[in-house]
Amino acid sequence: KAPNGQTMHFVRIIKGDINKGDYVTLTVDKENRFTTCQNHTATHLLQRALKDVLGEEVNQAGSYLDAKTLRFDFKYTGKITDDDVIKTEERVNELIKENLPNETEIMDADAAKKTGAMALFGEKYGKTVRVVKFGPSKELCGGTHVTNTGNIRSFAIKTIESKGLNVYRIEAVCDTNLEIELFKIIKPYNDEMILLLKKAKKIVSDAKE
């Protein structure tokens, strides 16, 4: 943002040019916005699910998301098993199926924290904050989200890895991006099956000659 609080936009000129003083019209890329919202809300649900499965000691250490994927770093001193990962994924999908509504409220920062709203450690907040709530998930957040958790449709954890002492990173996908990832995984096996089928047909054909 600019020093006076105005939002600044970075643009890439595809055709033509822009000059100082020009007026421009901005439009939202609805598809990109929707999938980004899916991943953002899913990140909130993931943190809630991790706390439900591993315990309240889980704390966010960072995150990244875009229209295709989400990444969540967190601190946890214990060992994470495959069963923990499965339970976490299942818990997120349970919250999705509950169609929990987006309840957003502007509150005094101290009052918000007293309600149990999660805040990112080390982050500086103003006197008033925006609280985003989806059922048991409640966080201080200024970003865009879906109107209810059912909009996410589906969620899957791609990977989980250690990023240092007691720090883990989860990468996950939602909805149509999940389908794309599954296709990437299945395609090599599918191509191999097609090749084997062609070889089998050739062997049978050669045997008949």
Segments (PLM) and residue ranges:
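A glycine- and charged-residue-rich anion-binding loop/surface
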Residues: 1-209
